[in-house]
């Protein structure tokens, strides 16, 4: 396909238009008085959301050059979401603020490379100061506060705090749709390990790039599967029952993987293959743990078992399995309690007997997976539209809470970014252009507070000026339209979220400012289809 190219000023102006169109849509959702955005779906009811990354991913602009600018901002939001699970709207607002100021200076003749170096220096200074201002999360109440802020719901905050209390801060917490209208928590037997699907064509949810298997059979083997004939008799029995299948194997290669993928795409049956966790002897032990949890048998030559002779009775089962590109979570396995307890007792004995710290650590990890269970938050709502919106909020809150446990928390409502403004202003650039880049970041740090205030109907610059004069922990509570001590009031943000938002915004903004040419496809004018002739089907 033919390409069109724009250079320097033309290219940057088109990119900026795209940045503004996306950012102006997303930033209306920031803060407690933020508005919702309605997204049209290709099928089904429209989605109502205030989740920045969901809105950013949904936007496609007609102008190819503007669309490139929009997609780069969406990348900043998406990357922040991947790292911290929240802060996507803040990342978008910061990107727009840095790009707009930067473009003005580039048009006025500043060197974009020097500006970018200044932006990088300023970002490092801001992140260092953020970590100095950070508080550690220690109590259940603090966990509940972080989750409540992110989800805008005390009920959800309390549920997430309770879930973390029951399965531990590093425990597995999953989210499911409830059959009723209540949102509830349950703890079931389950396990998560760090292996994802072998092919992205196995996903069942393209938005989240996840595969969900309901009530699947689970084949557990330490062998490589390269010949589909080895498992064909078993597959035929599973197809007849209309059940799904999770394959946990040393590897699935050769003609076996494409054959499984093809059958999945055609809808013959739902199958996902993952590599077995661990290595060497530890792999065999972990497979035995999974077998105990799911009520299956490890198909291994060590036990004299062959793949081609596998019976359905040797397969494990679970109520649900969720597979992402990086992990597999088994929820509510069908293993007998006695078998699981036997494994637990064996591991505890091994922990007592081993003298190696490394072995002890690995054994403790296995023990935690077998005994910790999986906390399941069942999200309920009266309508499907409300359910989707509520589920987005629970996911955001869970991710934000994990981030706070990792790196601590800072004053919320954009206050933490205003508090690092002085540290950035104190940073000196080696050249005038570098200093310009530093000043751009210093100004951009106030953009989230301005936007939160404007969404609440206040004048942003007045709020920022007031915050500069008061105690660093005092911020603007937009929900109640007053200035309060944000830490005391529990209006807090995870440090990781704020840090990631700033770093990703600075990274994308630096790339946009140093762009000198943009190459885009020229859309083809497709002739309209001819009307159907009489008698044609």
UniProtKB/Swiss-Prot annotation:
This is Chaperonin GroEL. Transmembrane segments: none annotated. One of its GO terms (biological process) is protein refolding. Belongs to the chaperonin (HSP60) family. It comes from Lactobacillus delbrueckii subsp. bulgaricus (strain ATCC 11842 / DSM 20081 / BCRC 10696 / JCM 1002 / NBRC 13953 / NCIMB 11778 / NCTC 12712 / WDCM 00102 / Lb 14). It holds the Pfam family Cpn60_TCP1. It catalyses: ATP + H2O + a folded polypeptide = ADP + phosphate + an unfolded polypeptide. Keywords: ATP-binding, Chaperone, Cytoplasm, Isomerase, Nucleotide-binding. Together with its co-chaperonin GroES, plays an essential role in assisting protein folding. The GroEL-GroES system forms a nano-cage that allows encapsulation of the non-native substrate proteins and provides a physical environment optimized to promote and accelerate protein folding. One of its GO terms (cellular component) is cytoplasm. InterPro entries: Chaperonin_Cpn60_CS, Cpn60/GroEL, Cpn60/GroEL/TCP-1, GroEL-like_apical_dom_sf, GROEL-like_equatorial_sf, TCP-1-like_intermed_sf. Gene3D superfamilies: GroEL, GroEL-like equatorial domain, TCP-1-like chaperonin intermediate domain.
